[in-house]
Amino acid sequence: MEFFKYIFYGIIQGLTEFIPISSTAHLKIISLLFGMDDPGSSVSAIIQIGSVFAIFWYFRKSISNYKNTNSRKPSYSFLFNKLNKSIFIGTIPIVFIGVIIKLFVPGFSDSFLRSNLSIALVSILMSLIMLFADISTKKSINLNNHKYPNNLYIGIAQAFAIVPGVSRSGATISMALLSGWNRKDAAKFSFLLGIPSISLAAFVEFFSAVNQFSTFPFLPLFAGLITAFFSSLLAINFLIKYVSSHGLKIFVYYRLIFGILILFNL
């Protein structure tokens, strides 16, 4: 039973990490619906490593050999090309906020912000923000012509995803659209921006839970990580294709209904 529970966690994590509906909220709420314990931030973060591997695999060519088409000199440097500089800039806000929370708000993971009421209210608020972003985009900015300040704004939006229910992909795609990005590249950059942020979260939680290692079911946890990898690949492929042609409205409606249902069942 324990084995299948973590496979279930992996499926939910992988699908909802990239579909803009909040993986943390769905892991918590769906687990409760099926009579299972909230996996908690440590387990969630470790399973998220599978999602990081999925991003690396899906975008492996973009990460290692990205070229700025506006330049006559193609960039072959992994560390210093424009895309990776953009990811670095976009990661700064969540690192800054994460360090502050870790040092000065030790009870954050058990605070009101992880409660069902907070998740419901945040989900409803995010549905409205996503709707406004979807109808406001100018579609003029892409991965080749974006400016570094855009990356910082998107990174600030990502930092808000520390709050359960926000959705990292929902916040970053919305901010990218509000900044004038086209939908397809907004989704791509959102996923690439997740590599350092998700990795850092997993790293911090992994070492924070070092004293609990003896109680961790490693084989089921590994199964959840592998499941998250494959379900993440499906979610990434689906969302890029879907958002490019249909936008975010279906997720807006889903998040609105999701939040209202939680409110009525508190």
From Swiss-Prot:
Alphabetical list of Pfam families matching this protein: BacA (PF02673)
Family named by the database record: Belongs to the UppP family.
Other notes: Bacitracin is thought to be involved in the inhibition of peptidoglycan synthesis by sequestering undecaprenyl diphosphate, thereby reducing the pool of lipid carrier available.
E.C. number: 3.6.1.27
Gene source species: Prochlorococcus marinus subsp. pastoris (strain CCMP1986 / NIES-2087 / MED4)
Its job: Catalyzes the dephosphorylation of undecaprenyl diphosphate (UPP). Confers resistance to bacitracin.
Subcellular location: Cell inner membrane
Main location: membrane
GO annotation terms (biological process): cell wall organization; peptidoglycan biosynthetic process; regulation of cell shape; response to antibiotic
Protein name: Undecaprenyl-diphosphatase
Transmembrane spans: 1-21, 39-59, 87-107, 117-137, 153-173, 189-209, 216-236, 246-266
Catalytic activity, as annotated: di-trans,octa-cis-undecaprenyl diphosphate + H2O = di-trans,octa-cis-undecaprenyl phosphate + phosphate + H(+)
Domain of life per record: Bacteria
Membrane topology classification: Multi-pass membrane protein
GO cellular component terms, A-Z: plasma membrane
Disulfide partners: none
